Structures are given as structure tokens and as C-alpha cells.
């Protein structure tokens, strides 16, 4: 008799599952469902809202610890937006960029909690964010400059003979922003969680094989703990990188360079 053993894939943790669904005959048999990615994004939105409430200082002179943390994030993102765009236009787009940073950061941090779900590891979410940013920047460019916006694809000092080729390259590069912005975020979160899952399973198998192997497994366990700290840093860095590049795209649309 053959014994079958279930093999767990590191990709199982990223599977989108229906948690609750209901058919609505009154709405053309539309199926309404709540998935794990929708649930965790909703949780992230509530956490962001609750964090803002905790950080409200109620006009007190001495700030609380939540106010200090929010002011630190506020000052950091404000500096990034103003430096990337400019003092005048940066103020207008700062609220959107700050909200975008907090949303991505909280989703990244939720993904670090054991047995939770990493929403930002899914390309459907990150590509939706990147497409929205690039499309918004493109619409903004046409609104500000009209057809002159196409001059963005013409490099300065370009020889006339190379103009068609370089314009094509610049246009493809512009379209690639939609993919690269979302791909960078999802790929970093996805690869980090997969590596942690593989190393954790490997370490568990070693440490559960006996007392000697348990002692030997302390070394990879220490590495996993250190790597988890690195993943926390990546959660912050990738949120910041997404905002920096988004600001850069908006600046290109406003200033055509």
C-alpha cells in the first residue's frame, strides 16, 4: 500500500480564499463574497483610522507616544513629497501620498504577523495601485500641458535621425512604469515571505528530530529571527520607495522632465 503525504507549498500562504459568500437572486444572481485579501485590507484601513484617533493629542502641550510616532511619519513623508515634487505642488499631493504610504506600510506589517495574510504580495493589489498612480499622473500631465505632454517622450538634444527610435523607447519605458512600480513591491514581499516559510519549515524539521538536532537548529533559528527583523525593515523601505517613485512620476507630468 502506498502512503500519501501532503506536501505543503510555500505558495499556499498567498492563496486567496472565500471566507463568506452569498448569492443575490434580486441582483441578477450576483455572488457577493468576502475574501481573505479583502478582509485584511479592511483590517488595515481600520488600523490606520484607529492609529489616527490614538495620535490625536486633543490640544495638549505634551504629545503622547502615538502623536510622536505619527508626527515622525508625517514629517518624513512630507519631506519626501516636497523634495521630489516641489514646495508649491508638493503640498497638494501630500495627503494622497501620506495615505498611500500608511496603507502600504500597515498591509506590509500585517503580513509579518504569523498565520496572517500578506495583501501586498499579490500583484492584483500592487498593480492596481501602480496603474492608478501612473494613470492619474498621465491625466494630470494632459490637464496641465495638453498635447505638449507628448514632449516628455522626446529627449533633449536628440538627433533628428534617432528621434523615432528614442521616442519609441521612451514611450515603452513610460508604459513600463505601470508594471515596475507594482512589481517591485509585490516581488519583495512575496520573496521575503516565501524564504521565511521555507527556512521555518526546514528549521522545524531539524529541531523536531532529536535533542542533538534541536541544539543544531538553534543556529538557523537565530538566522530566521534576524531575517524577520530585516523583513520589517523592508516593509518600511518598500512603502517609502513606492511613494518616492509615485512623486517622481507626478513631477514628470507637471514639469515634463
Curated annotation (Swiss-Prot):
Pfam family, one: ATP-synt_A
Transmembrane segments: 34-54, 93-113, 122-142, 149-169, 187-207, 210-230
PANTHER family tied to this protein: ATP SYNTHASE SUBUNIT A (PTHR11410:SF0)
InterPro entries assigned: ATP_synth_F0_asu, ATP_synth_F0_asu_AS, ATP_synth_F0_asu_bact/mt, F0_ATP_A_sf
Gene3D superfamilies: ATP synthase, F0 complex, subunit A (1.20.120.220)
Cellular-component GO terms for this entry: mitochondrial inner membrane; proton-transporting ATP synthase complex
Entry's family note: Belongs to the ATPase A chain family.
Intracellular or extracellular location(s): Mitochondrion inner membrane
Entry superkingdom: Eukaryota
Gene Ontology molecular-function annotations: proton-transporting ATP synthase activity, rotational mechanism
Organism: Cochliobolus heterostrophus
HAMAP family, alphabetized: ATP_synth_a_bact (MF_01393)
Keywords: ATP synthesis, CF(0), Hydrogen ion transport, Ion transport, Membrane, Mitochondrion, Mitochondrion inner membrane, Transmembrane, Transmembrane helix, Transport
Subunit annotation: F-type ATPases have 2 components, CF(1) - the catalytic core - and CF(0) - the membrane proton channel. CF(1) has five subunits: alpha(3), beta(3), gamma(1), delta(1), epsilon(1). CF(0) has three main subunits: a, b and c.
Annotated function: Mitochondrial membrane ATP synthase (F(1)F(0) ATP synthase or Complex V) produces ATP from ADP in the presence of a proton gradient across the membrane which is generated by electron transport complexes of the respiratory chain. F-type ATPases consist of two structural domains, F(1) - containing the extramembraneous catalytic core and F(0) - containing the membrane proton channel, linked together by a central stalk and a peripheral stalk. During catalysis, ATP synthesis in the catalytic domain of F(1) is coupled via a rotary mechanism of the central stalk subunits to proton translocation.
Name of the molecule in the record: ATP synthase subunit a
Topology of this chain in the membrane: Multi-pass membrane protein
Amino acid at each position: 500500500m502506498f502512503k500519501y503525504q501532503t506536501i505543503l507549498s510555500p505558495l499556499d500562504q498567498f492563496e486567496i480564499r472565500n471566507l463568506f459568500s452569498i448569492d443575490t437572486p434580486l441582483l441578477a444572481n450576483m455572488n457577493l463574497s468576502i475574501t481573505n485579501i479583502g478582509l485584511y485590507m479592511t483590517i488595515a484601513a481600520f488600523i490606520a483610522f484607529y492609529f489616527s484617533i490614538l495620535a490625536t493629542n486633543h490640544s495638549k502641550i505634551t504629545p503622547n507616544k502615538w502623536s510622536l510616532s505619527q508626527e515622525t511619519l508625517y514629517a518624513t513623508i512630507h519631506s519626501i513629497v516636497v523634495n521630489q515634487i516641489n514646495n508649491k505642488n508638493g503640498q497638494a499631493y501630500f495627503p494622497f501620498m501620506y495615505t498611500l504610504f500608511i496603507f502600504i506600510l500597515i498591509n506590509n506589517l500585517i503580513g509579518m504577523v504569523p498565520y496572517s495574510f500578506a495583501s501586498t504580495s499579490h500583484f492584483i493589489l500592487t498593480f492596481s495601485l501602480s496603474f492608478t498612480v501612473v494613470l492619474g499622473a498621465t491625466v494630470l500631465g494632459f490637464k496641465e500641458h495638453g498635447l505638449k505632454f507628448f514632449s516628455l517622450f522626446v529627449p533633449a538634444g536628440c538627433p533628428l535621425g534617432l528621434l523615432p527610435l528614442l521616442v519609441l523607447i521612451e514611450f515603452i519605458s513610460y508604459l513600463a512604469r505601470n508594471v515596475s512600480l507594482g512589481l517591485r513591491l509585490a516581488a519583495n514581499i512575496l520573496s521575503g515571505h516565501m524564504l521565511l516559510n521555507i527556512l521555518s519549515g526546514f528549521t522545524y524539521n531539524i529541531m523536531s528530530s532529536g535533542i542533538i538536532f534541536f541544539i543544531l537548529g538553534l543556529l538557523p533559528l537565530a538566522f530566521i529571527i534576524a531575517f524577520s527583523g530585516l523583513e520589517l525593515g523592508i516593509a518600511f523601505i518598500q512603502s517609502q520607495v513606492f511613494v518616492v517613485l509615485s512623486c517622481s512620476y507626478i513631477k514628470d507630468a507637471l514639469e515634463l522632465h
